[in-house]
């Protein structure tokens, strides 16, 4: 029997209570105790939480994940022009546990975003502002298992986002020096959850996410290889603040349980440093071709834990207050018409939290 945040089973009493039958939600007591560390949590709590986390995080992006400006020839006039159109694909896998350790959740996601500048202006010199629009689609599929009961639940969230971004470079030609990037997106999502032996539930979530990011890049040295290729070494400290305001609608399950989301309004902080080597191959002279392998290390902090209240009983995601991240990849200009960049990212937190993703 599922009620509130817990699963209950019918069991015979012991000792003097052998002739009585009880609904229990604990290994050690014959009567349920309202304590998430003693009672048997429903796996659906993990699925509700995962959907909320995915809706708040799947469209979070960084400047270098959508950076690039390429040249093309106008088909009508034949004149060379520049375009800032970009597209990013990301796939990821995530694992985490709840605060009691009873629920284990894993999920897989896919996200596509695209956008481009709609205006640019400068204040003289090489500095320049970029104003752009972006939109995206993403989905996340998850499974949660309850360690004590062996019950499982599955969930999914599918959604769209649209928003604006603005970026300033102190040097728009080389992207050295300081930069400032900000964006805001509105997202709306369809959610589903299905527990073992229970009717499926559906609800919607929606809300705003916004970001402010800054950094400073400088060249700390250069060296030549034995083949005469020039290598330039860069370092860039970065900082980013993301406000996450996607909130799920209240839901009454078929059994009457009230489902409320928690954790919206979380402020996600990222502090880190990126270093890369820009390789200028002698064979590519005059071909506008260059490659930059990079490594990035970040510390991530969240001010709130995402979770759910089921008839007022809280269940939350654990291990995400402080997360370490390592990211490596390559950014390259194939020719004047095409830039490509890709990376692999690993995040590790407390209590078994981890996330792995790849982006192109």
Locations of regions flagged by a protein language model:
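Extracellular, surface-exposed repeat/solenoid domains
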Residues: 1-26
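Hydrophobic beta-strand residues in large extracellular and virion-surface proteins
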Residues: 23, 210-212, 271, 295
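Outer membrane beta-barrel translocator domains of Type V secretion systems
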Residues: 26-226, 343-345, 350-359
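Outer membrane beta-barrel transmembrane domains
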Residues: 160-163, 238, 245, 254-360
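Short acidic/polar capping segments at secondary-structure boundaries
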Residues: 185-189, 240-246
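Intrinsically disordered, low-complexity Ser/Thr- and acidic-rich flexible linkers and loops
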Residues: 223-228, 283-285
């Amino acid at each position: 029997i599922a009620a509130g945040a817990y699963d209950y089973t019918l069991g015979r009493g012991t000792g003097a209570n052998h002739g009585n039958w009880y609904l229990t939600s604990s290994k050690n007591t014959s009567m349920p105790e309202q304590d998430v560390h003693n009672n048997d949590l429903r796996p659906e709590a993990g699925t509700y939480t995962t959907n909320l986390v995915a809706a708040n995080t799947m469209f979070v992006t960084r400047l270098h994940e959508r950076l690039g400006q390429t040249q093309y020839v106008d088909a009508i006039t034949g004149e060379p022009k520049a375009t800032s159109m970009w597209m990013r694909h990301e796939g990821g896998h995530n694992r985490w546990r709840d605060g009691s350790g009873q629920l284990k959740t894993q999920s897989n996601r896919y996200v596509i975003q695209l956008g481009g500048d709609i205006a640019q202006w400068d204040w003289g010199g090489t500095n320049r502002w970029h104003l752009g629009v972006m939109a995206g689609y993403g989905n996340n599929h998850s499974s949660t298992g309850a360690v004590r009961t062996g019950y499982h639940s599955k969930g999914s969230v599918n959604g769209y986002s649209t928003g604006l971004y603005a970026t300033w470079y102190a040097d728009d030609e080389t992207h050295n020096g300081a930069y400032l990037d900000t964006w805001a997106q509105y997202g709306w999502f369809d959610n589903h959850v299905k527990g073992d032996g229970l009717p499926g539930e559906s609800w919607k979530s929606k809300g705003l996410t916004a970001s402010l990011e800054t950094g400073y890049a400088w060249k700390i040295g250069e060296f030549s290889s034995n083949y005469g290729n020039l290598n330039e070494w860069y370092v860039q400290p970065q900082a980013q603040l993301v406000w996450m305001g996607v909130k799920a609608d209240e839901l009454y399950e078929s059994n009457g349980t009230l489902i409320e989301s928690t954790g919206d309004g979380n402020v996600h902080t990222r502090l880190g440093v990126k270093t890369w080597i820009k390789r200028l191959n002698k064979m590519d002279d005059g071909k506008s071709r260059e490659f930059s392998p990079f490594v990035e290390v970040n510390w991530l902090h969240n001010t709130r834990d995402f979770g759910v209240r089921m008839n007022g009983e809280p269940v939350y995601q654990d291990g995400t207050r402080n997360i370490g991240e390592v990211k490596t990849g390559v950014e390259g200009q194939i020719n004047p018409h095409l830039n490509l960049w890709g990376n692999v990212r690993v995040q590790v937190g407390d209590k078994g939290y981890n996330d792995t993703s790849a982006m192109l």
